[in-house]
């Protein structure tokens, strides 16, 4: 039976990572792959939705002349409109990526790539998010001018994806992160989220009118514990596969109840 796959991202409809994944998935599987992605770069926007402005869907041609749908909103908007207006049904899978830059640790809550995947899971689809490590920041923001090679990552994602076909999906979202030196033979490691991916840095500058403004930046964390996604990708140079859930309830719920319930 032909699968329905909704392919989204947060880097924009014309991302080469999106195109590489579409082509590899489309060639490998009996699937209808529908691309619905933001008109513009939406990195760092998390699972935000547009509530105070209308959204538009524009049919467009990708670099390989195939058809896609550009949405004037966030990655989560793309999933919502992709399901309710383009497909008019919940697909079998929502796949988000390939993101330019890794999405690791608890900072995944800021990721538009993960936001889209969680929205797909929220609608009842099986969801995967996939990201490629990029160690030079300027490559993240000048994709069209950079030598980033996505085909290997797309094939790795395909191989991971195949492991779940025919089985009951193991979690709400599977988060896949690929190191920048990976090959199709790079080991795959099942991991947990690290506490953090970056050490935050705020840079203050002064504009021509002597007013302060700020750039937010971060330095990559390397010293997370073994078994985490950060350690797997940055230290061991393995592909990281992390099972994620929509349920953000603290693991110590019973202990919390026992300690605090009588105080309310």
UniProtKB/Swiss-Prot annotation:
Binding site for a divalent metal cation: 10-11, 43, 99
Keywords from the named record: Cytoplasm, Hydrolase, Metal-binding, Nucleotide-binding
Free-text remark on how the cofactor is bound: Binds 1 divalent metal cation per subunit.
Residue stretches in coiled coil: none
GO cellular component, one term: cytoplasm
This enzyme's EC code(s): 3.1.3.5
GO terms assigned for molecular function: 5'-nucleotidase activity; metal ion binding; nucleotide binding
Annotated InterPro entries: SurE, SurE-like_Pase/nucleotidase, SurE-like_sf
Reactions catalysed: a ribonucleoside 5'-phosphate + H2O = a ribonucleoside + phosphate
Known cofactor(s): a divalent metal cation
Main location: cytoplasm
Localisation per UniProt entry: Cytoplasm
NCBIfam families in UniProt: PRK00346.2-1 (NF001491), surE (TIGR00087)
Stated role: Nucleotidase that shows phosphatase activity on nucleoside 5'-monophosphates.
Family: Belongs to the SurE nucleotidase family.
HAMAP family: SurE
Protein name, as recorded: 5'-nucleotidase SurE
Organism expressing this protein natively: Methanococcus maripaludis (strain C7 / ATCC BAA-1331)
Source organism phylogeny: Archaea, Methanobacteriati, Methanobacteriota, Methanomada group, Methanococci
């Amino acid at each position: 039976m032909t699968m329905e796959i909704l392919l989204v991202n947060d880097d924009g409809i014309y991302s080469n990572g999106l195109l590489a994944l579409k082509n590899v998935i489309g060639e490998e599987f009996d699937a209808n792959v529908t691309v619905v992605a933001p008109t513009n770069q939406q990195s760092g926007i998390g699972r935000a939705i547009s509530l105070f402005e209308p959204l538009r869907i524009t049919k467009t041609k990708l670099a390989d002349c195939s058809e896609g749908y550009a949405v004037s909103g966030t990655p989560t908007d793309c999933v919502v409109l992709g399901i309710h207006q383009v497909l008019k049904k919940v697909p079998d899978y929502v796949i988000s990526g390939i993101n330019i830059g890794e999405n690791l640790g608890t900072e995944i809550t800021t990721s538009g790539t993960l936001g889209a995947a969680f929205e797909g899971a929220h609608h009842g689809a099986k969801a995967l998010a996939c990201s490629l490590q990029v160690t030079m920041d300027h490559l993240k923001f000048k994709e069209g001018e950079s030598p980033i090679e996505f085909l290997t990552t797309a094939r790795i994602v395909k191989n991971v994806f195949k492991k779940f076909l025919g089985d009951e999906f193991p979690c709400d979202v599977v988060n896949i992160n690929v190191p920048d030196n990976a090959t199709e033979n790079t080991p795959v490691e099942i991991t947990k989220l690290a506490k953090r991916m970056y050490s935050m840095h705020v840079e203050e500058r002064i504009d021509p009118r002597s007013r302060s403004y700020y750039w937010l930046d971060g330095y990559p964390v390397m010293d997370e514990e073994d078994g985490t996604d950060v350690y797997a990708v940055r230290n061991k140079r393995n592909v990281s596969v992390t099972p994620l859930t929509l349920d953000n309830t603290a693991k110590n719920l019973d202990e919390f109840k026992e300690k605090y319930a009588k105080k309310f």
